[in-house]
């Protein structure tokens, strides 16, 4: 079995490269549990408001690509993958409202997947407003 992969770095051409990969029927993996690109949507994630990237929902709505929540867990004898059902891309309102609603659904799916093995989820930066407040209080 041959698996080919390619990293598309964040930058001015990233969007068009990802859209090209989608049109070529490639599988795209996007980091969705933190906002690294600055295009974000406010959602509730583990009971607190935070910002998550709008990219996955935006790309899926614009291209019709299937949006699947996926997690890979380390097990004693290797890795185990879980693929959740596709997230509905049904249009219910204005584009931005649909992006927000779908991004909230992504957050809920990530909560489900993270709860399966929370010790395997790692954040290397503050993710919630309360994280930044607690960092400021440390000496």
Language-model regions, residue ranges each:
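Non-catalytic C-terminal accessory region of glycerolipid acyltransferases
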Residues: 12-139
